[in-house]
Amino acid sequence: MSKEIIAKAQERMNQSHQSLAREFSHIRAGRANASLLDRISVEYYGSPTPLNQLAGITVPEARVLLITPFDKSILKDIERALNASDLGLTPQSDGTVIRLVIPALTEETRKNLAKDVKKVGENSKVAIRNIRRDAMDEAKKAEKAKEITEDELKTLEKDIQKVTDDAIKTIDKMTADKEKELLEV
């Protein structure tokens, strides 16, 4: 019983780490990265379609994203979606491809992005602590139902806390690495 509780908590914490990594990949660090466009949807035949399903996205230079639509007729729709997005980038079209030039980040922008990174990291820690609370509650229920002894409960609580501490350390490291990446010029 105790192994299942820990395994379940660990799995949920790993999912939280993956979610954090995805969030961090969407925060631009002054370099071109195709994952910046993962959240962009384009109206295509009346339904929102992810941009990466409608166009090839390449990184020809460090600060340039090149978007090559599979169907040239949707070029304007892609431009419209990029302009409406919260990326703050202006698409440049030459009729066949769209270029997105990623500007160098100003010091102020870097600091604001670093604050965002801290906030996202903190939210992730809250999620981890909620997972710990759920696991602790589950362990206490198991003890009340006489599925585990009081000694096993104490051991299980220590194990859950250790898994939680490891998960928080991982989040701290991921957050610090992303901040460092943002703040280096």
Curated annotation (Swiss-Prot):
It comes from Streptococcus suis (strain 05ZYH33). This is Ribosome-recycling factor. Coiled coil: none annotated. The gene is frr. The lineage of its organism: Bacteria, Bacillati, Bacillota, Bacilli, Lactobacillales. Responsible for the release of ribosomes from messenger RNA at the termination of protein biosynthesis. May increase the efficiency of translation by recycling ribosomes from one round of translation to another. GO terms for cellular component: cytoplasm. It comes from the Bacteria. Belongs to the RRF family. SUPFAM superfamilies: Ribosome recycling factor, RRF. It is found in: Cytoplasm.
